[in-house]
Amino acid sequence: MARYRHSRSRSRSRYRRRRRRRSRYRGRRRRYRRSRRRRRSRRGRRGYYRRRRYSRRRRRRYYY
């Protein structure tokens, strides 16, 4: 029983590590966007955000 529990926790940790890596990358990009938002105009920012959102969705489809 102990061996089964250990193997299960090992697989779960591997899954969590992969998720954390992606989330950290996304957080860094969000901070970059926030710093850039102040410089851009209101209309330009909206167009930029829309383009980023589309690209992210496309990449996600490619991932899975």
From Swiss-Prot:
It comes from the Eukaryota. Keywords: Chromosome, Developmental protein, Differentiation, DNA condensation, DNA-binding, Nucleosome core, Nucleus, Spermatogenesis. Residues 1-64 are annotated as: Disordered. Testis. GO terms for cellular component: nucleosome; nucleus. One of its GO terms (molecular function) is DNA binding. GO terms for biological process: chromosome condensation; sperm DNA condensation. Belongs to the protamine P1 family. This is Sperm protamine P1. It comes from Hypsiprymnodon moschatus (Musky rat kangaroo).
